[in-house]
Design a protein with these regions (language model features):
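Two-metal-ion RNase H-like nuclease active-site motif
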Residues: 60-67
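Acidic, metal-ligating active-site segments
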Residues: 72-131
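Long, contiguous domain-sized segments
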Residues: 1-59, 113-465
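Alpha-helical structural signal
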Residues: 54, 67-69
């Protein structure tokens, strides 16, 4: 490792390049075979035009995006860090959307400025390396306590804890195995590490104000169920924990808005939800330690969609936009052989053969432990290509073989035409294959490396004693 401000020798790579062991190793390496011209030219045959349906496009869009940053407390002691997570929520309504676009691929800057009035940003401040919060004993406990407090403070009504993100988390956790609407099970106590065996299960009950471990008596927090505290370290960077937390919070916020609408508009929630679509930056998936919550979101949306269908309404509209990755690379490779306006529901077979080149595919389905949405590939009417994700219309993945087949059957997704129409409408020229909702959400949430992060560094230094 270099000293601070020490620069590397500009010719130090020569020893590596000329090392005979390295040369021999590189000679044995070979790339995974590329798609041949026939594979590329025939790929477009799998695409088709989406079927029309009787559902209308929504007038309201909620776009959610987040970013995180680890700020150093002192220049002299850069290993003392505070974590910042910012998740922005933008509400775009029919009139504002038409004003932004103005019939052009270029956005109207004056209309964009007005959108700021409907922008809501949620900030989470979490202790990271070498920082202890309140009366906690170490960084891990500090992270847990701070996260739980901030989930509780994020409320729609300040005097009603039932409107908090924490209550939404409890409801989602109740869908986990061994849990119900009155109690949830945590994987293990963060202090004594008991709870993993059948005879020492640890529950947190709905009305517990200050739950404690029955084995060691230490304080537990509802947010412990997310397990994002597990990789938190005292003396190393905690960017992994911050990233996992941001990922699950973005998706949990969408569910929180849905729950709020359902519970506060008991007579008209179906009409409201039918006229609303959530845009989420990234796939509909939960990664890392909280991954099991993908199944909770899947079950909740399935149950709600059953009610929506009984009322002759569209399924909940939620779309994850994937801006990069292997599927995007594949789509860009074959896009010239796809007609404008055509869409494809990606199967595991095609993914394994042409995207991941997995010749020994497992019996499990792609994203079994993480995804609650299906990948679609689309070339819009302007010729731009998008990889997007929509919720699975199934309750669970228990019958893997059947799920693997049915998830890639486009006929199971009743509102694909709505999604493709939205991708036509919101296409903009600000970035390559950019969409207005995701661009705006990122605009108001991104913590830029400078000057945004510099401000957070200064804030951390001035507030911590």
């Amino acid at each position: 490792m270099p000293y601070q401000n020490e620069h590397a020798d500009k010719i130090s790579h020569i020893d590596i390049v000329q090392n005979p062991d390295i040369v021999e190793f590189l000679e044995k390496c070979h790339k995974i075979e590329d798609l041949d011209s026939e594979d590329i030219s025939t790929a477009g045959k799998r695409f088709s035009f989406p079927e029309n349906n009787h559902y209308n496009k929504p007038d309201n869009i909620i776009s959610i995006d987040g970013s995180f940053y680890e700020a150093s407390r002192k220049k002299e002691f850069p290993s003392q860090k505070i974590g910042f997570i910012k998740v922005g929520v933008i509400l775009l309504q029919g009139k504002s959307l038409s004003e932004i676009q103005g019939g052009s691929r270029f956005v109207n800057p004056y209309a964009v400025a007005k959108i700021k009035e409907n922008n809501e940003a949620y900030s989470f401040v979490l202790p990271s390396t070498n920082i202890v919060y309140d009366d906690c004993e170490d960084v891990q406990e500090s992270f847990r306590k701070a996260l739980d407090e901030q989930f509780d403070k994020l409320r729609d009504k300040l005097d009603d804890p039932n409107t908090s993100l924490k209550t939404t988390l409890f409801k989602m956790a109740s869908y986990l195995d061994g849990c119900d609407e009155n109690k949830i099970k945590i994987s293990k106590c963060p202090c004594c590490h008991k709870g993993e065996k059948q005879d020492d299960i640890i529950y947190i009950h709905k009305n517990d104000k200050e739950p404690k471990c029955p084995h060691c008596g230490k304080r537990l927090y509802l947010t412990d169920v997310l397990r994002v505290w597990e990789p938190v370290a005292d003396v190393a960077s905690n960017q992994s924990a911050l990233s996992r937390t941001m990922n699950v919070v973005e998706r949990l916020l969408a569910i929180h808005y849905i729950r709020t609408i359902v519970e506060s508009l008991k007579e008209s929630f179906a009409n409201t939800l039918e006229n609303l679509c959530f845009f989420i930056d990234g796939p509909l998936a939960v990664f890392g330690e909280p991954a099991k919550f993908h199944a909770c979101f899947m079950k909740y949306l399935y149950e709600l969609n059953q009610t929506m269908r009984l009322l002759n309404k569209s399924d909940i509209l939620m779309i994850g936009i994937q801006k990069s990755g292997a599927v995007n690379d594949y789509l860009n490779l074959i896009k010239d052989h796809i007609n404008n306006g055509e869409v494809y529901c990606l199967s595991d077979e095609i993914r394994n053969k042409y995207v991941t080149f997995n010749k020994n595919a497992a019996s499990d389905t792609f994203g079994k432990e993480t995804y609650f949405g299906q990948d679609f590939l689309y070339k819009n009417k302007k010729g731009n290509v998008f990889v997007f994700n929509v919720p699975y219309p199934f309750e669970d993945k228990s019958k893997v073989a059947n799920f693997k087949t049915e998830k890639s059957n486009i006929a199971n997704y009743k509102n694909i035409k709505i999604y493709t129409d939205l991708l036509d409408d919101f296409d903009c020229a600000l970035y390559e294959n950019a969409l207005v909702p995701t661009v705006l959400a990122h605009k108001y949430t991104a913590i830029s490396l400078a000057p945004g992060s510099k401000v957070l560094d200064l804030l951390s230094k001035s507030k911590i004693v």
